[in-house]
A protein has these predicted regions:
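N-terminal secretory signal peptides that target proteins for export/translocation
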Residues: 1-10
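Tryptophan (W) side chains
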Residues: 12-14
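Soluble non-transmembrane domains of integral membrane proteins
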Residues: 30-222
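Flexible extramembrane loops and terminal tails that flank transmembrane helices
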Residues: 208-211, 230, 357
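Channel- or pocket-lining gating/hinge segments that regulate access to a cavity or pore
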Residues: 219-347
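Juxtamembrane boundary at the C-terminal end of a transmembrane helix
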Residues: 357-364
Length: 364
């Protein structure tokens, strides 16, 4: 019995020591800084983001590599302090800023559309005497963005940064912006970008769905860019328009005398077949250089379709009229002659008119 009571008391002492150790550890742990509730809920975080430098745009990967400056501003009355002579604000940078942020409430805001880890990140923190806080974060990273090639090469795209609040729903922390935040986001947009012209900056709200039907505050900061279409004319559109002449020339090169065609259909078929292989090679080259053009309907795919249609129509004309003389057998050689003359003049108008119309639709 004595052994059992000793074992029982030892077990209780062991459990008590574990409890005291856990209690001591939790008592010394620092609680997480609470939300600044002096202004009520939600805590409004003024947000601005500018593209400071755009290194490259990869349309095939649908991404861009850029350096962005994210500015967050909010008020925390607990951080107010008596104004010192000659100092407008307290300034912290890099490691000092991170150490100061560890002791205060900071909104959990992240750039959600980055790809991989940032190659560079730094912080700058300013605290004003009235409790106003301004946090500036510079980040260099690759950003996922969407590209719509439907109006290529007259298209406009948007380089976007997705700013999201984590951990708190939009009823507790809300991202917002005013005109000065939009002006900050638009600053630096006059910088040059190879093959693109920079345009306006837009900010839009779009809440992000969370667990249990909660919504998290989210802003999209979008920089509009317009493609310089002259860069795509020489490698893509000049060959496409030139290849349209192949089936037209194959039909036009024949001549008719007294209702009879003078050039062998076999020679003209060789021209069309050669043009077909040329268009296939051009199609393969364009899709290799611009894979995104083959994934959607756009001006380039329509012009390729027009090329294939013109080649097929030319081959049908050569076989039906030049090789087998089907119209002559059915309606006579003079009807066939007039039909051929009509095709010689109508086909170029239809083909080239359609090609120009496709370009005008993309430009509209």
């Amino acid at each position: 019995m004595m052994k059992k009571s000793a074992l029982h008391s030892r077990r209780w002492r062991w459990l008590l020591s574990i409890f005291l150790a856990l209690h001591g550890a939790t008592s010394f742990a620092e609680p997480a800084p609470a939300l600044p509730l002096a202004g009520g809920l939600p805590v409004v975080v003024r947000t601005g983001l500018r593209f400071d430098q755009i290194d490259s745009i990869d349309e095939n990967e649908r991404s861009c590599t850029a350096t962005v400056d994210l500015r967050l501003r909010w008020r925390d009355a607990r951080l107010a302090y008596p104004k010192e002579d000659g100092a407008l604000f307290q300034n912290f940078k890099d490691a000092a800023a991170e150490a100061r942020m560890a002791t205060m409430w900071v909104p959990r805001v992240e750039l959600a559309n980055t790809i991989g880890s940032p190659t560079f990140r730094t912080f700058s923190l300013r605290i004003y005497p009235d409790g106003q806080v301004e946090l500036m974060q510079r980040t260099s990273s690759k950003f996922a963005t969407s590209f719509d090639p439907q109006r290529f090469p007259f298209d406009q795209q948007k380089l976007a940064a997705e700013v999201v609040v984590r951990g708190d729903d939009q009823d507790r922390v809300a991202l917002d912006y005013h005109q000065d935040d939009l002006d900050f986001s638009a600053s630096g947009s006059d910088r040059k970008l190879d093959r693109w012209a920079l345009g306006l900056t837009n900010i839009r709200r779009e809440p992000l769905s969370g667990l249990y039907d909660t919504l998290h505050s989210r802003l999209w900061i979008e920089l509009q860019i317009r493609r310089q279409f002259t860069m795509a004319m020489a490698p893509i559109f000049i060959p496409l328009f030139a290849s349209l002449l192949i089936p037209l020339m194959a039909v036009y090169m024949n001549r008719v005398e007294d209702g009879e065609f003078q050039i062998d259909a076999f020679e003209l078929c060789n021209i069309v077949i050669g043009g077909l292989f040329a268009v296939i090679a051009l199609n393969f080259t364009v899709n290799s250089a611009y894979p995104m053009l083959g994934d959607a309907d756009n001006t380039v795919t329509r012009l390729f379709g027009l090329n294939y249609l013109a080649l097929g129509a030319a081959l049908a004309i050569i076989i039906a009229l030049f090789r087998f003389n089907l119209v002559q057998r059915a309606l006579g050689k003079y009807v066939q002659e007039q039909l051929y003359l009509s095709i010689v003049w109508a086909a170029p108008l239809l083909v080239l008119g359609t090609a120009i119309a496709l370009l005008l639709v993309a430009m509209a």
